[in-house]
Amino acid sequence: MKSTGTIINKIYSPLSAQGQGVSIQGYEGSFHQMAARQFFGSDIEVIPCATFRDVVKIAANKKESKGGVMAIENSIAGSILPNYTLLQKSNLKIVGEVYLPIKQHLLVNPGVKLEDIKEVHSHHMAIQQCMEYLDKYNWKLVETDDTALSAKHIQQHKSKHIAGIAGKLAAELYNLNIIVPNIHTQKSNYTRFLILQRSADSKPIEGANKATINFITNHAKGALAKVLTLIAGNGINLSKLQSMPIAGTNFTYSFHADLEFENKSQLDSALSDIEKLTEAINIFGIYKNGNNQPS
């Protein structure tokens, strides 16, 4: 079977070989896999991909997966703008979301003590998230492509003087000890992940109370303000508004919006109201609000 994207693990698991796994970015043990388990359950098979583009390609291919999991924003770093573009160009719909607390731990092989550590390996973002702790030591900091990859290499090479920074799942999968837990500086750090499924396979979700849309306003003065007023007038909470430049235009933007509602009739009414003020509306998904959002 020819792959449509770059898959890190070239050998499929039995489940994902039947197109039943979900594509994720990063290696096994990554935060993407933790998000997949939180949504689907611990038995879900994952298809690790090198890039977000590959996540979308694999998720869009019925022969290779049943969908995908893709990070879209972080409570500290903000939105991952290129992923909005990937979503817009795909045949995928949002069918769910996960808000995952990002907890970084210092991992070592069994028997390694804190005084044995000379180097710490991890993704550059994870290292930056933990600098307040790392500054206490004179360790060499080495950047890798993925938090879980650093854990995997430490286990494979049986390193006695190298520690890694990664999540709890990476420690479990690679049989590493969490020598110091929760070394991240900002204790309230969440990443929001979208659960993606092919449009042809997606079905109406019972109890849905959130929608993600993209719209382009017409060029009338105050059009965006009027759109937002109409949305609020239908009792809908606008939980996110993200502008995106439209390729090939000079400072013309589309807007990604997350809308929270109590019943779908509110959404239907709002979409009908704003239609006359917009040049285009695209519904990316109607789904259930994540149950574990940060307060």
Can you annotate each of these PLM segments?
Residues M1-S295:
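Domain-level signature for soluble enzymes in the chorismate/prephenate branch of the shikimate pathway
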